[in-house]
UniProtKB/Swiss-Prot annotation:
Zn(2+) 1 binds at C40, H70, C158. SUPFAM superfamilies: GroES-like, NAD(P)-binding Rossmann-fold domains. Zn(2+) 2 binds at C100, C103, C106, C114. Binds 2 Zn(2+) ions per subunit. The lineage of its organism: Bacteria, Pseudomonadati, Pseudomonadota, Gammaproteobacteria, Enterobacterales. Belongs to the zinc-containing alcohol dehydrogenase family. The gene is yphC. This is Uncharacterized zinc-type alcohol dehydrogenase-like protein YphC. It is an enzyme of class 1 (oxidoreductase). It comes from Escherichia coli (strain K12).
């Protein structure tokens, strides 16, 4: 029996490496040799420290003890019967939710919002990409354009795709002043994508000066401010002659969400991308009287994720430039500890050829 090394998250801020059997693809499945696998903030929040549940199902933790990693990218090395659209040797990224395929949300191309039986997230309710090989459904695959690296693909499969959907929902265009609050990996990508869409001016806000410096270094931000700066909504209003046309909150923080709302121009769009938490505001004074719109955006669709990959190629923008730390699978414990510290940009686990 051929075996492989795989990483599990038992909780208590630890990583467990195990030797397990290499899976065999069944009908409509492929076996992928992993090349790069990202670590997402949700892995840290919901699994790494402790196995969390949602308010809707408080007695059922989201993580069900599978191989972790929901940002996988690699190369197909074997295929089961019934596969028709891909071939061995194809470089692919994997949409990180495998949906039922038949519910209204799956029909719209959004497996993330699947309401049918059998919905499973790679790395949470089925084996994910923190292993030498990944078993995936052919329907969940997206072909990686030649110009993009495996690291780019891993980042696209969740973080970049999430930012891309927010940019689309916010209808960012060349006439827009864009504000991004929270410059973690998703926020950094939101600025990069806003740049690709031709945004007139891009403003970033974060608690950490290191993240502002990184955004400047990447060339994706025109103006950056610490979140502790006094009077930020007024400063942004003066800079933009009335406020941001589009504000994207990627912080998931109550203060960040309120800042995004209050810094938006009349008739502007506010997109909430960051997960968890709450926000409180005056409905009349902060929203209605300014004719502002609030839009919720959760991950993206298969179609938009594929379009995102091609847009990045056309715009010559490379998500890998925001990766600050790379680890081997054997170093997964160090990778998660660093990601949990917040003292980094994007973190990936890479695999040898």
């Amino acid at each position: 029996m051929k075996t492989m090394l795989a990483a599990y998250l038992p909780g208590n801020s630890t990583v467990d490496l195990r030797e397990v059997a290499v899976p065999t693809p069944g009908i409509n499945q492929v076996l992928i040799k992993m090349k790069s696998s990202g670590i997402c903030g949700s892995d840290v929040h919901y699994i790494y420290h402790q196995h969390r549940a949602t308010a809707a199902a408080p007695d059922k933790p989201l993580y069900q003890g599978f191989i972790n990693g929901h940002e996988p990218c690699g190369q197909i090395v074997a295929m089961g019967q019934g596969c028709r659209h891909f071939k061995e040797g194809d470089r692919v990224l994997v949409y990180h939710i495998s949906g039922c395929g038949f519910c209204p949300n799956c029909r719209r191309g959004f497996p993330i919002s699947c309401t049918g039986e059998g919905k499973a997230a790679y790395g949470w309710q089925r084996d994910g990409g923190h292993a030498e090989y990944l078993l995936a459904e052919e329907k969940d695959l997206i072909l990686l354009p030649d110009a993009l690296s495996y690291e780019d693909g891993a980042f696209i499969s969740c973080g970049v795709g999430t930012a891309y959907e927010g940019i689309l929902r916010g209808e960012v265009s060349g006439s827009d002043n864009v504000l991004v609050v929270g410059l973690g990996p998703v926020g950094m990508m939101a600025m990069m994508l806003a740049k690709g869409r031709g945004a007139k001016r891009i403003i970033g806000v974060d608690m950490l000066p290191e993240r502002l410096a990184m955004a400047k270094q990447l060339g994706v931000m025109d103006h950056g401010y610490l979140a502790t700066t006094e009077g930020l909504p007024q400063i942004i209003a003066e800079l933009t002659h009335g406020g941001a046309d589009v504000a994207l909150d990627c912080s998931g923080n109550a203060a960040g969400r309120l800042l995004a709302l209050q810094s938006t121009a009349d008739w502007g769009r506010v997109v909430y991308i960051g997960e968890t938490g709450k926000v409180e505001f005056e409905v009349s004074a902060d929203l209605m009287h300014h004719q502002r719109r609030i839009i919720g955006s959760w991950v993206t669709s298969l179609f938009h994720m594929e379009k995102c990959a091609h847009d990045l190629t056309d715009w010559k923008l490379w998500p890998r430039n925001a990766i600050t730390h790379r680890f081997s699978l054997e170093q997964a414990g160090d990778a998660y500890a660093l990601m949990a510290s917040g003292k980094c940009g994007k973190v990936v686990i890479n695999f040898p050829d």
